[in-house]
């Protein structure tokens, strides 16, 4: 609830500022603006308001001291007067007036001279000076950097300001400079970072997340070689952050070839592992061959975890790097995990299309079955990936793997029906369905039969009496008709099929009824000269071609 209150207050302030700005632009307010100076002290300001104002570094620059706002400064007179008007008139926050008198500032002020006066003014209430002399923590420019910060820093460093003062997140000004680095303003940021480095700012000081300025320089999109070399002179090249990433991890991830080369030449640990077990080499290999060559040519022997590194390449679909490392004999793609997962199975799992095609073209075995009963095909269905499914089916998987795939697919309540139909359509064209159904083979398909009636129903086309496995799986409209195709006598006694519930009980009852009809009709026909000569199997075969109604009718006639 507190979060929502805070957000509502933020938006209220924000909208109020815009409303005031519109009012100021539509009406003549020169008499109001003249009433306010750019320098003001406000007592006991709500911290939420201070936090909000501090998020607008491009509009306002705020100095704090305890519960008071010491100073509000902006390059734009109108913006400054708007916020002062807002604090005075809208929020009714009391002020004690300016603590530096008679500056008479205008929009064309000399910033350097102005800041110098702020720091050195002899007024007894000069709280900025008191704050610096007492070594108080402040976030006035440590947390929120504006265009004029370089001038602030130069003056304050010359007056003994502690250059590595921390904010509430443990960040120094050097941290913040790198956090907020903008390419569009790189010249200003580069100048400030050099000032801080040349004045001894600690490049190994960690914030609350374990980031040092040097780690941040490696992590962020800053490609200034001069700054990197200055930092490198005093930095711990193997320092780690909260996730145990080193500078070499980050420059490898960012594909900063020159920085990687410098760190390796300085002896950075190429086998350092982060908390996820990844080394800098793993981070670099996804970007291409140049970084791979750089690592392989280093004097230190690389620690290679084959399964880990191949899977890493698969996740990023880095085919070029995979091919190069295979050609150098660094990795082997023919691994199997304890779950019987292969590199091809991993490529399907991570939707790495290019890698999958590459591995299949190398005659990789994709007919693997994991310990949980999954296959590459069932995994493609689970990922709803039609393109990968088409690639796998184009490689002509066997009947065994297709049946196992469909069983695995239908074990899940939710699956892509269209992809399952692709499997059925492919399997229906195969010629391996010559065996008549019996109890044992029925057990093999029970999960499939039970869970995909809709898909089966679409494939039904014929009602041949002696059903094969193909006809049972793909041509039956309803499970109740199973009783017409149970060729094995013990099917009637198969109690394990009770998983089907009432349907199976009805099937068994129907089969018993049909068996009784056939038996009775056969006995009725036995007195005939020719019928009694037939073996019982032939009698049964002939009578089985009649449906239940026909059998009942013949019995009545006889």
Curated annotation (Swiss-Prot):
Keywords: ANK repeat, Late protein, Repeat
Top-rank taxon: Viruses
Residue stretches of each ANK repeat: 65-95, 169-205, 209-239, 243-272, 276-304, 339-368, 372-401
Cystine crosslinks: none
Repeat listed as a keyword: yes
Entries under Gene3D superfamilies matching the protein: Ankyrin repeat-containing domain
InterPro entries noted in UniProt: Ankyrin_rpt, Ankyrin_rpt-contain_sf, PRANC_domain
PROSITE patterns registered for this protein in UniProt: ANK_REP_REGION (PS50297), ANK_REPEAT (PS50088)
Function: Contributes to viral release without involving rearrangement of host actin.
Family affiliation: Belongs to the orthopoxvirus OPG189 protein family.
Protein name (record): Ankyrin repeat protein OPG189
